Amino acid sequence: MVAMDPTGPSESIYNLIPSDWKEPPQPPRYVSIFKATVKDDMQKFKTAMKTMGPAKLEVPSPKDFLKKHSKEKILPPKKKFEWNERRKPPVPLRTDHPVMGIQSEKNFINTNAADVIMGVAKKPKPIYVDKRTGDKHDLETSGLVPKYINKKDYGVTPEYICKRNEEVKKAQEEYDNYIQENLRKAAMKRLSDEEREAVLQGLKKNWEEVHKEFQSLSVFIDSIPKKIRKQKLEEEMKQLEHDIGVLEKHKVIYIANKK
């Protein structure tokens, strides 16, 4: 087989040289990285002998052949019926005749008439007719009669709601009292002259101590810790001077009561 080079000239003596064509090697086969995991899961959740049955099945013996009536259901043995309840008295015989000739002095006509006269007349059930053909319906359950608005407790607030409103009102009063008590405890308290003077002297004493420590610093501040210490002392002195100025300027001072 002669291979033609498409990039070179169309005709060349070198094109007549036969070339050995080799089949390129196949790429490696794809193997999933989850193959072992899937295999383990299949072994874990697989039910044994579910599709093909057990590996070895015991062959029935020729001696245990199917016998006649062996598949029929065997009924339980019969039990004797026993009646434990008390029996009724026997029916009278044909030869037994009732006692005849017994008379009563009760006047059933007058008794029935008196019962009718003294009895309460039955009231007809109220009905209504909604069609000309005479279709009757119960009037009480129809909703046409004002039944509930005529009740004694109609429009009256139920007892449980009144009780609940009282509980809510009581809880609100307790909450308001609690808030007022906290506000009273956290009210502003006036600082007395003795306490103001004691606080002022304490601040001045602290300022003197910080100022003395500031004067003890070295002349040359050539390190970061020294600079930080100097800045800290300057801030403390500045804050103390501000507090002293406030106390000296204002004679009446109120503070928050934290008790």
From Swiss-Prot:
Residues 163-255 form the Enkurin domain. Residues 163-258 are annotated as: Interaction with TRPC proteins. A motif (SH3-binding) lies at residues 86-92. It holds the Pfam family Enkurin. GO terms for molecular function: calmodulin binding; SH3 domain binding. One of its GO terms (cellular component) is axonemal microtubule. Expressed in trachea multiciliated cells. Residues 179-190 form the IQ domain. Residues 1-26, 76-98 are annotated as: Disordered. InterPro entries: Enkurin_dom (IPR027012), Enkurin_domain-protein (IPR052102). Residues 76-88 have a biased composition (Basic and acidic residues). Signal peptide: none annotated. One of its GO terms (biological process) is establishment of left/right asymmetry. It is found in: Cytoplasm, Cytoskeleton, Flagellum axoneme; Cytoplasm, Cytoskeleton, Cilium axoneme. The keyword Cytoplasm applies. Keywords: Calmodulin-binding, Cell projection, Cilium, Coiled coil, Cytoplasm, Cytoskeleton, Flagellum, SH3-binding. Microtubule inner protein component of sperm flagellar doublet microtubules. Binds calmodulin via its IQ domain. Interacts with TRPC1, TRPC2, TRPC5, but not TRPC3. Interacts with CFAP45. The IQ motif is involved in calmodulin binding. Adapter that functions to localize a calcium-sensitive signal transduction machinery in sperm to a calcium-permeable ion channel. Microtubule inner protein (MIP) part of the dynein-decorated doublet microtubules (DMTs) in cilia axoneme, which is required for motile cilia beating. This is Enkurin. It comes from Bos taurus. The lineage of its organism: Eukaryota, Metazoa, Chordata, Craniata, Vertebrata. The gene is ENKUR.
